[in-house]
Amino acid sequence: MSKIVKIIGREIIDSRGNPTVEAEVHLEGGFVGMAAAPSGASTGSREALELRDGDKSRFLGKGVTKAVAAVNGPIAQALIGKDAKDQAGIDKIMIDLDGTENKSKFGANAILAVSLANAKAAAAAKGMPLYEHIAELNGTPGKYSMPVPMMNIINGGEHADNNVDIQEFMIQPVGAKTVKEAIRMGSEVFHHLAKVLKAKGMNTAVGDEGGYAPNLGSNAEALAVIAEAVKAAGYELGKDITLAMDCAASEFYKDGKYVLAGEGNKAFTSEEFTHFLEELTKQYPIVSIEDGLDESDWDGFAYQTKFWRQNPAGCDDLFVTNTKILKEGIEKGIANSILIKFNQIGSLTETLAAIKMAKDAGYTAVISHRSGETEDATIADLAVGTAAGQIKTGSMSRSDRVAKYNQLIRIEEALGEKAPYNGRKEIKGQA
């Protein structure tokens, strides 16, 4: 009852008003899976290719009709009649048929949409939730945990039209007992942050990921106003809630220097910028820093990893959910945490392989959204089904972000004590 009988691809709209690929996979017995590919703003140069049409007369060149045609044409022809339960086999057929290193023939957006839709259809055919099916595909059946949210409540960099260099300032409700409580804590801090910003005469418009995007006097001021909001919400910073940042440093890396417009265009070397960030960690309980250097700055990352020792030095643009690059990073002692993004690699099977490699090496794996999202909440199921421990899916506004939090609430309700929320224990160096 899990044989594929029909595949449909279509062009839909993401949270930034740009087109993306949605796919449906239909099986015998009437089972259907549907999924959509997300899209990033600050992207690593070695990510799998997101295929765009380039026709400037339509969606300013960002249409995805070529990728949709690949879904409805060669991909559908190759997969009809195949067993959807064989996820690795389905993904291999698409990857081999594409035949390129970075999925540039069909587009990672086409392959990923079908890959995820196939997993959803197979789960439906097996009569189980997606997270349970993912746990089985991961080789860890019945082993679940609820992830600690990393809530991006101040947006900067490529995610906002403001003067803040660092792209994400996040809170982690590590003191919560359940993910539902963690989400409530995050919501309360988010609303108190609005009051803090308004009292200072600052803008409370939001960025791509639902966090506030005010103009600030410095990057450190973002941490200061968050600390004020945490206190106003009745929580203790460092105990109930810790902080995290995504620098997206590749976006302000110019001619071998890190140039911060928000710090008066001050330029830093790799070591100087590492120490700049270190000073922030001395002032605030920042327990995770992502993309603290440019993706090409391997020597700088090695220094940063050794310098910080216990705290997670996460890599997103550098590793791009790619096991070949991650393996090299592990061998060279680069970072100790990886961001997991489906569309950076382009299939569920390859995503699961990256999570396994990271965990086997003692790295933490943070399941992450992209700045261009849809209502698709698959990453919530991925985080629970792989017991990843942490999830990044934006702030407490915009339905494209909240959809993932709501799915986590539903999953926790269904699993109960089978999926513990481990809070601080999930954060490297904080257990």
Swiss-Prot record:
Q: Any idea which UniProt keywords this protein has?
A: Cytoplasm, Glycolysis, Lyase, Magnesium, Metal-binding, Secreted
What reaction does this catalyse? (2R)-2-phosphoglycerate = phosphoenolpyruvate + H2O
Similarity annotation? Belongs to the enolase family.
Question: What species does this protein belong to?
Answer: Shigella flexneri serotype 5b (strain 8401)
Q: Its gene?
A: eno
Q: In which pathway does it act?
A: Carbohydrate degradation; glycolysis; pyruvate from D-glyceraldehyde 3-phosphate: step 4/5
> Active site: which residues?
E209, K341
The name this protein carries in UniProt is Enolase
Its cofactor is: Mg(2+)
Query: What does the record give under GO molecular function?
Result: magnesium ion binding; phosphopyruvate hydratase activity
How does the record describe its quaternary structure?
A: Component of the RNA degradosome, a multiprotein complex involved in RNA processing and mRNA degradation.
Q: Which cysteines are joined by disulfide bonds?
A: none
Naming one, the record's GO cellular component terms include: cell surface
* Enzyme Commission number(s) from the entry: 4.2.1.11
Compartment annotation: Cytoplasm; Secreted; Cell surface
Role noted for this protein? Catalyzes the reversible conversion of 2-phosphoglycerate (2-PG) into phosphoenolpyruvate (PEP). It is essential for the degradation of carbohydrates via glycolysis.
The record, for InterPro entries, names: Enolase, Enolase-like_C_sf, Enolase-like_N, Enolase_C, Enolase_CS, Enolase_N
**What does the record's cofactor remark say about binding?**
Binds a second Mg(2+) ion via substrate during catalysis.
Keyword Transferase in annotation: no
Q: So where does (2R)-2-phosphoglycerate get bound?
A: Q167, K341, R370, S371, K392
Q: What NCBIfam families does the record point to?
A: eno
Q: What is its main location?
A: cytoplasm
What PROSITE patterns would the database entry show? ENOLASE
- Sequence intervals crossing the membrane: none
